[in-house]
Amino acid sequence: GAARIAYPPDGAVLSFDPDIPRERQRLIFLADGGGQRPTWTLNGRPLPPDTVQAGWEIRPGRFTLCLFDSDGNRTDETSFSVRGVTPPP
């Protein structure tokens, strides 16, 4: 069957923790099914494969994550938000 987003779930509210170093706060996007390496977009922008594998460095805001198959068909979509204040780099 078509790949589906396993994490984060739709409607998830995540929190940025200012006591943890920024570079250690990463979100791993997970997919189930599909059999091939999917393509991801976050708020309409493609995510490079290395970002997906290493984890996306979280930042506050609202986000829409989409999953596409190898033919470019969207197979799933989820929305999530991140609360908190990001410290300066």
Regions found by a protein language model. Name each.
Residues 1-89:
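Soluble, non-transmembrane domains of envelope/secretory-pathway proteins that act on or interact
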